[in-house]
Amino acid sequence: MPLRLDIKRKLTARSDRVKSVDLHPTEPWMLASLYNGSVCVWNHETQTLVKTFEVCDLPVRAAKFVARKNWVVTGADDMQIRVFNYNTLERVHMFEAHSDYIRCIAVHPTQPFILTSSDDMLIKLWDWDKKWSCSQVFEGHTHYVMQIVINPKDNNQFASASLDRTIKVWQLGSSSPNFTLEGHEKGVNCIDYYSGGDKPYLISGADDRLVKIWDYQNKTCVQTLEGHAQNVSCASFHPELPIIITGSEDGTVRIWHSSTYRLESTLNYGMERVWCVASLRGSNNVALGYDEGSIIVKLGREEPAMSMDANGKIIWAKHSEVQQANLKAMGDAEIKDGERLPLAVKDMGSCEIYPQTIQHNPNGRFVVVCGDGEYIIYTAMALRNKSFGSAQEFAWAHDSSEYAIRESNSVVKIFKNFKEKKSFKPDFGAESIYGGFLLGVRSVNGLAFYDWENTELIRRIEIQPKHIFWSDSGELVCIATEESFFILKYLSEKVLAAQETHEGVTEDGIEDGFEVLGEIQEIVKTGLWVGDCFIYTSSVNRLNYYVGGEIVTIAHLDRTMYLLGYIPKDNRLYLGDKELNIVSYSLLVSVLEYQTAVMRRDFSMADKVLPTIPKEQRTRVAHFLEKQGFKQQALTVSTDPEHRFELALQLGELKIAYQLAVEAESEQKWKQLAELAISKCQFGLAQECLHHAQDYGGLLLLATASGNASMVNKLAEGAERDGKNNVAFMSYFLQGKLDACLELLIRTGRLPEAAFLARTYLPSQVSRVVKLWRENLSKVNQKAAESLADPTEYENLFPGLKEAFVVEEWVKETHADLWPAKQYPLVTPNEERNVMEEAKGFQPSRSAAQQELDGKPASPTPVIVTSQTANKEEKSLLELEVDLDNLEIEDIDTTDINLDEDILDD
């Protein structure tokens, strides 16, 4: 059967003629050397040109990455080898290597060597650790040496292809060739080694339009590939896939099966002659160089052929060899998340086909290997052949003895106990099939689910799935598309009822067969179910799980990984990469069981599971509960103080929030708790919280709102002591302590403001303040200081100043004490008063100093409302006054408030 090989173009880079290409082993870069003397580096993931080296004015026929040194090494027609640092773009070294055009460069995989070949018929070995000295010269060819390649299985051996129509195999340390292969009728342009361990083969391409496969141990030609219409310019064994890639001046790239030598595919991208090809171990990318640019194609799928059963036995294919590893053999070895597991690998033998996929059946007894359009079912223990056949696709049913194959684009067959049970043709054809509780068939029209037993249509859905994953219970299914994934619930009871009564059955199946639970805009690469939790790897290399509408990230992966399975007794999730490395991550089954129970609203089960969840995992569970709307349970479960505090605030749990705030000693938490306490009318608690938070602004608001003069007084002193000058000023001002306000402004250097305050409220102090202002300003600007006018010296500039002195004395005598809040309705608003008029005829009975000595300030004389506005409301105010007669602010019960106790004792 033909090799099923998907071919996808990843990059098209238009440029001058490309003479060589190379792929970087770790970065997504392609190196292309051009006939115009430049070397370009393209990023094939972003489709961008990232670096350019202007090497010379002549063709650069060879360029290679040396990743371990961050170098690009080039060879050109000016006979020079140049070495560039591809990070800094600087030229590290340059020397003349040959006496004619340099055709090829080969980098030794482990030693500090490069090999170069040239039109001077020589091959030279250079050692960069010895200042690029020439360590050896290999002579023997009688024409241009077109290509050299190092044997991947023996790094001391290399082969060369020459226009003298021969292939020579050499050994490092020996100046003469080990042997020569002859058979081409014209010059040989290219050569490559087979990297697998099963065949000692070489491939060559020549101007006779032929490709030859050689056994270099027997020194014989084992196969000749014909088909190209012009000179063969490049030929290569792919290091991963069972294919041979050849390119020719006829503009085509041909892909051949490396075992059957059958032509599998011919590529023609219309970019004229093909000159070079490059591939890389561990990657399915192939770079091609043409007259008009370069191309990268991706062959096949990079997902490894690998599968794990429920007991931890892993089977994978390495080329055609099948190997097994057992997680149980690791014993109690300490495992760290994301670290490669040191597994003992056991060879199980070779497979008759090249495995593209391997999959255990649900009970793990059998394993199916698919590839080359065929399938073989083996016993999982001994890899004994149980059944085989031709199929384009294979899918296991939930019943371990049942499976389906897609024989063609129109026929699907179902087998039970390895015998054909039923064959049917889906209505709209079959482009792909999916296993599980129902048989899924994708067609051009969408996805159809069929009953395994009778192939009856259950439901047709207009969707183009990429993967389908069923939960073990069969209740939930994930349908992953190219852009998102859907979580559906399979309603089996309604399906059975509809099948019996035939109600609700349409041409698209049973309408109530599925219920959509959610759609998530994320691309699923691989996935599996554990209970009601769907675990998956995403396109951005994240390991997540989805439960109840919430996505939880387990880990950020540093490379593409593929899910193998979950073993509950280990509480670990296992993944593999394309290099067949196995890693694991901790994922507690108790957490998944708890979340599953919550989703099913089975809280009795959730309560039983909760004690088995470790404390370090409780907060994750609490976040899940919070998102599901169970905040009270989340508060009980969470162990994170920050999370518990937020939940306590949301739930109005003042006691819990208070305890957490005491433990945290965070100003922010005290402020948040104060807001909650105020909203709950717990003013005593609010005062304590604001005090801990040193929130003087909040304390001032609380004190003024409650009319607590003593608290305002203490607050003023404390705020001034702690440098909260704005709050201190406002507190003094609210108490009418204008002298304290003035002194505060002077002490803090706010002399202009002090002068204006004195002019407005304390005219007797204005002269002193202006003098201070003038002295201070003179240090900066003498002229500006001299321009300040003292009101006592320039009375003509300050009309009404003398009257202001009288008013100041009048205010001091008549406003010595604060008025009770109950008199507020009887006091004229400031904006309606004329203090000058009120103080007319006032004669100070004694000086302010005498009053201060007596300590007996005059009783306050409230100014009864006489404004027009007040007269209109006189009746209502009198009624209000009657109501207030029996109400004293001191009579209010403040036992829970204690606003004036220990305000700032600390």
From Swiss-Prot:
It is a peripheral membrane protein. GO terms for molecular function: protein kinase C binding; structural molecule activity. Disulfide bonds: none annotated. WD repeats lie at residues 13-52, 55-94, 97-136, 140-180, 183-224, 227-266, 350-388, 390-425, 746-783. GO terms for cellular component: COPI vesicle coat; cytosol; Golgi apparatus; Golgi membrane. The modification N6-acetyllysine is found at K627. Residues 866-891 form a coiled coil. Keywords: Acetylation, Coiled coil, Cytoplasm, Cytoplasmic vesicle, ER-Golgi transport, Golgi apparatus, Membrane, Phosphoprotein, Protein transport, Repeat, Transport, WD repeat. It is found in: Cytoplasm, Cytosol; Golgi apparatus membrane; Cytoplasmic vesicle, COPI-coated vesicle membrane. The modification Phosphothreonine is found at T861. Pfam families: B-prop_COPA_B_2nd, TPR_COPA_B, WD40. The modification Phosphoserine is found at S859. Residues 837-872 are annotated as: Disordered. GO terms for biological process: endoplasmic reticulum to Golgi vesicle-mediated transport; intra-Golgi vesicle-mediated transport; intracellular protein transport; retrograde vesicle-mediated transport, Golgi to endoplasmic reticulum. InterPro entries: Beta-prop_COPA/B_2nd, Coatomer_complex_subunit, COPB2, G-protein_beta_WD-40_rep, TPR_COPA_B, WD40/YVTN_repeat-like_dom_sf, WD40_repeat_dom_sf, WD40_rpt. Oligomeric complex that consists of at least the alpha, beta, beta', gamma, delta, epsilon and zeta subunits. Probably interacts with PEX11A. Interacts with SCYL1. Interacts with JAGN1. The coatomer is a cytosolic protein complex that binds to dilysine motifs and reversibly associates with Golgi non-clathrin-coated vesicles, which further mediate biosynthetic protein transport from the ER, via the Golgi up to the trans Golgi network. Coatomer complex is required for budding from Golgi membranes, and is essential for the retrograde Golgi-to-ER transport of dilysine-tagged proteins. Belongs to the WD repeat COPB2 family. PANTHER family: COATOMER, COATOMER SUBUNIT BETA. This is Coatomer subunit beta'. It comes from Bos taurus (Bovine). The lineage of its organism: Eukaryota, Metazoa, Chordata, Craniata, Vertebrata.
